[in-house]
């Protein structure tokens, strides 16, 4: 007999979330089925009993998968089964991973796998906002050491009011879309996009989300009590030698502090200097001793290096590269560097550099999104590439990783709101990171702004981005907020807070916090300091290019749009696409047509004005209504014994009878001298009311000969 344990969370708006354990996947270390409405997510967690020898990090793997059957759909493709993870699934994985990872004990190194699967969906509630809660609940009912519980919610602002976990329909009306993850006491992760909101609005949204999360966390703690999983497993994944730890600190700390305070701006030289201190310490040991103690020395020295860097900032206000806490690295920009793309830019900030290109395309270039719960076409794309050479690493370049998808998505959210809604082009921005020493995603935002303006894209406003950091020791009042952080400051610091925006407000943000007890006062200081940094960077961008170019590059496609009555869509496409394909072959233009808002919307793209004008002329001819008495220049399409058929408007043929070719009597059609392809001026005499056939005449346009008198 199965006796599952169920915990119900009552939400302020009347909706409920249930957490059920003990019914499914009982061999996993922890499993929970979360249900909200008809949306159901199963989260399972499994951890190895021991760590792989030599592992000194947290080998956590989070997977999120949506079943097409959850929404009563078949997957696409020939195999008709789910394939590799979509971008949306990868982004959801990252949201959960970033919320969970900081809460595992520092000395816990066993492999942990968290799997979240969407088994049912109703198209109303958004499952990505529930995945974090499901994963945390699975960890809560397991014996895996974890410093949670946490929960994750989406907060949207709709008509000035904050809504927690809005529906798909509600989110479309929001001017703020923010995902927040937190424990009962502390915010851990924030990510979202917004329509140029203030720093105070962002903080208010985070506070509203945290209040909702507290309810979720309390329910999980009660679930742990009911399940009996409050006591976690014992483990020993690190061996320590306190005498060796003390020896490393005494021998190396002062030297490491001196390097941290030296202000060397070259990260490789600085790292070599740090490494030399450790290597010098190791010289006192034999090879046999280093085989036993080498890994411990490396770990203890890493702690020394971290402490030296942090104390130097807190005590002297001096950063690794010599900057003050609010100082931005030197910036230089260039636009139009690449002649081939339709727009390009280089943005360099210190040792971080992005080379970004822009390509303009037509509707045919749109990205087709076919996720389980979301099907649409995307006209603004941004791709981020992080090759190994950007950090001087000697390794092969593999496919696109989760990090690249996540960084690209953040930059995409930062910029997309500044592309006008009716902009006719499909736009692809590609950022290739040439050098990296911190905040390469923010360099992508800045380079993307420059490249878009260089391409002549009608951006509403330029956008800049900055990454903020924090140094704060537990139990110590003193702290330092850092502007424009280095890679080492991200790694050794307590916060990575990325903020993008225009002069009028924030457009996107991403925050990861590794420290407990971070107050909203500190977050507000970080946001206001970020605003100053963003404005400084914006000034540098607009010095390089003040506004979008007035015209596109000569080799960029030109697009014209026109609307037609929807009943003419079929006439323009033709049977099997014959007419539209023929127009494209004849003119060299690319033509797309679709029905929107009760009319046919046509986009005509070409590399020059002539091909677009030619296509528009043909289309106007097709949709033109033939009028009796009008004169047209037509083309002979076929020759018959009794006359010729003339196409006097695109797709409209009429009979020019042999008797209507000339005033004089013609015995045979050959006497007229007409052949296929000849142009001839005709007048529309009549339209048969029953058949719709057109009767044409050429002779009425000729002078009528005078009648000769009979002798």
UniProtKB/Swiss-Prot annotation:
Primary site of residence: cytoplasm
Domain of life according to the entry: Bacteria
GO cellular component, one term: cytosol
E.C. number: 2.7.7.8
GO MF annotation: an example: magnesium ion binding
Catalytic activity: RNA(n+1) + phosphate = RNA(n) + a ribonucleoside 5'-diphosphate
CDD domains named in the record: KH-I_PNPase, RNase_PH_PNPase_1, RNase_PH_PNPase_2
Tagged with keyword Methyltransferase: no
Binding-site positions, Mg(2+): 490, 496
Any Pfam family the entry gives: KH_1
NCBIfam families cross-referenced by the UniProt entry: polynuc_phos, PRK11824.1
Family: Belongs to the polyribonucleotide nucleotidyltransferase family.
Protein name per UniProt: Polyribonucleotide nucleotidyltransferase
Naturally occurring in which organism (per UniProt): Phocaeicola vulgatus (strain ATCC 8482 / DSM 1447 / JCM 5826 / CCUG 4940 / NBRC 14291 / NCTC 11154) (Bacteroides vulgatus)
Biological classification of the source: Bacteria, Pseudomonadati, Bacteroidota, Bacteroidia, Bacteroidales
Gene: pnp
